Amino acid sequence: MEYIEGNTGKWEYVIGLEIHAQISSKSKLFSGSSTLFAASPNSQVSYVDAAMPGMLPVLNKHCVYQAIKTGLVLKAKINKYSVFDRKNYFYADLPQGYQISQFYYPIVQDGMIEIPTSTGDLKTIRINRLHLEQDAGKSIHDQSPYYSLIDLNRAGIGLMEIVTEPDISSPEEAAEFVKKLRNLLRYIGSCDGDMEKGSMRCDANISVRRIGEALGTRCEIKNINSIRNIIKAIEFEAKRQVDLLESGETIIQETRLFNVDSCETKTMRLKEEALDYRYFPDPDLLPLIIPDELINELKASLPELPDQKIEKYIKKFGLSQYDAGIIVSDEAVAEYFEKAANECNPKMLTNWLITELFGQLNKASIGIRECKITPSDFAKLIKLIEHDTISGKIAKTVFEIMFETGKAPDKIVEEKRLVQISDNKILNTVIDEVIAENSKSVKCYKSGKDKLFGFFVGQVMKKTECKANPTLVNKLLKDKLDS
């Protein structure tokens, strides 16, 4: 467990998260308006979204299906009876004057996610609930010093609010939880998890306490928009609370915002309680009844999940837990890997994926779906190395050409005459030349300066333009020099 080092001793983190995940759906939760990102302001607003008198909400069943699927992968209880409630508050970008949410009877309860800890063990983070709710619009304050603008394109978009128990004990655990959750949502297609676009937002409830003591007063940090900022926001807020408590002051229960530039949290407003929102069942919406048949149908439609893939990669392909975890952290990478791994050495493929391909993708700022190298061609490259057709060094050159052009590796090797030299006769001739040209170095080597061996290997590789089989060069050269 990680502690906060105060001036008077150690303190514990107590952290709970609320994740707002925008549901992947072409239309909003209670209207047929589009959910397309970055559309012109107020171009995707129906009469329902704008709260025109007499307009009634109609529930989008696809959003319900997405919530059920999410509940299933969270190993949670799907409530067959749930109710929509009105959460009443006034804000300019909430035209109804209330938000349709689920307070008393949510669609999902009692789930869990296991995350890796710093000790290498798995820790269970309990999920209290997942409920459906509609998003608010967007207030724009930087267009004029005299007024604000309202864009209602986002108003009414379906959200899943996923609420954890306060089981998280460090900023790193919070980050691991969000990464694991985001990956699960992406695998089942219920949310794209793009925090930069705001389709996944994190609120962190943070308190601190002396080791083993009762829970302290919590503060909520709103709308943290990246994994890195989750860590920074929690670290700052926990340290702020420790400093206050050690100075004899009290913690005020409040909502705070994280300033990305200063890496500090600032007061936003005093924390509201549930009573402040005057929740009551929405009279325009019937209770949501979910039959067993639908739950079973959606369960059968779920894809293979990350933890299942990790287990498969370890057993079937012999990968380490660490390497398997890296591959499954992106569904597209896992799909690419599986297509290639069935055609070549999976361990060698994994090494090349993680070191070479990831490096090039990061450099080009693209994802694996935009990569010009097909899984089949990647497998061909690995087989060329396996069969000693090309050396590892030449393979890197071939790989760079493949990445730029999308050409098949065998064609590149043929066009550029890069086939590895494994003919003993040819290599012995080159070795003889190197020995003849470096007689002084040969004498030094034979007098005990073994480190010169690498120099001779380098000379052979230079003469063959790195086409010589390095394993064979080492053997033949050693035989010659030691004779």
Swiss-Prot record:
One of its GO terms (molecular function) is ATP binding. The keyword Transferase does not apply. GO terms for biological process: glutaminyl-tRNAGln biosynthesis via transamidation; translation. One of its GO terms (cellular component) is glutamyl-tRNA(Gln) amidotransferase complex. Transmembrane segments: none annotated. Keywords: ATP-binding, Ligase, Nucleotide-binding, Protein biosynthesis. Pfam families: GatB_N, GatB_Yqey. Its EC number is 6.3.5.-. Allows the formation of correctly charged Asn-tRNA(Asn) or Gln-tRNA(Gln) through the transamidation of misacylated Asp-tRNA(Asn) or Glu-tRNA(Gln) in organisms which lack either or both of asparaginyl-tRNA or glutaminyl-tRNA synthetases. The reaction takes place in the presence of glutamine and ATP through an activated phospho-Asp-tRNA(Asn) or phospho-Glu-tRNA(Gln). Heterotrimer of A, B and C subunits. Belongs to the GatB/GatE family. GatB subfamily. NCBIfam families: gatB, PRK05477.1-2, PRK05477.1-4, PRK05477.1-5. This is Aspartyl/glutamyl-tRNA(Asn/Gln) amidotransferase subunit B. It comes from Rickettsia prowazekii (strain Madrid E). The gene is gatB.
